[in-house]
């Protein structure tokens, strides 16, 4: 039986981001369990030869990568040492996904350096970004060096798609 892919509107947003020349690292904010990780990983697997994935909530040790220098070559060396041979860094063909980035504020600060370096696409996801009182704030928010978008749970149209209602039927109902 063939698996059915969950269609989300954010896939179009991610494709537009990737196709934009000189795009900035992307931050996706949204509530827990709304599909950020699933959507980003699916997009990455379909559009990049190599996916480097760090989930700071699942493995707090990943934060050590960002404790020292935030120079991109140093970060690549640290990620390679931590992740082993599965972490392949090929300019233009590798995406770095920093999941639950709010757990590692310095990873967010590093986005500025990834932007100025330009060799790798970077997406960070977070569910508590900007929540006052959470207590984990970066030294420096990379203002102007990141693109921030919001993601929400399935809307009604996405729900219909997920339940096998054809796009054509949805369009007929809308009209």
Predicted regions and their residues:
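Phosphate-binding site recognition
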Residues: 1-175
């Amino acid at each position: 039986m063939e698996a059915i892919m969950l269609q989300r509107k954010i896939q179009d947003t991610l494709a537009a981001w990737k196709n934009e020349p000189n795009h900035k690292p992307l931050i996706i904010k949204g509530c827990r369990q709304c599909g950020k990780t699933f959507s980003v990983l699916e997009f990455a697997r379909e559009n990049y030869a190599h996916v480097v994935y760090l989930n700071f909530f699942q493995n707090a040790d990943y934060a050590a990568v960002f404790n020292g220098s935030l120079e991109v070559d140093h970060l690549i060396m640290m990620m390679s040492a931590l992740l082993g041979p599965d972490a392949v860094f090929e300019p233009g063909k590798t995406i770095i996904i920093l999941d639950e980035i709010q757990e590692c504020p310095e990873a967010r600060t590093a986005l500025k350096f990834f932007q100025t370096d330009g060799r790798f696409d970077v997406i960070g996801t977070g569910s508590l970004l900007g929540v006052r009182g959470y207590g984990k704030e970066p030294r420096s928010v990379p203002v102007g060096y990141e693109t921030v978008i919001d993601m929400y749970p399935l809307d009604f149209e996405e729900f219909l798609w997920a339940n096998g209602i054809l796009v054509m039927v949805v369009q007929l109902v809308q009209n």
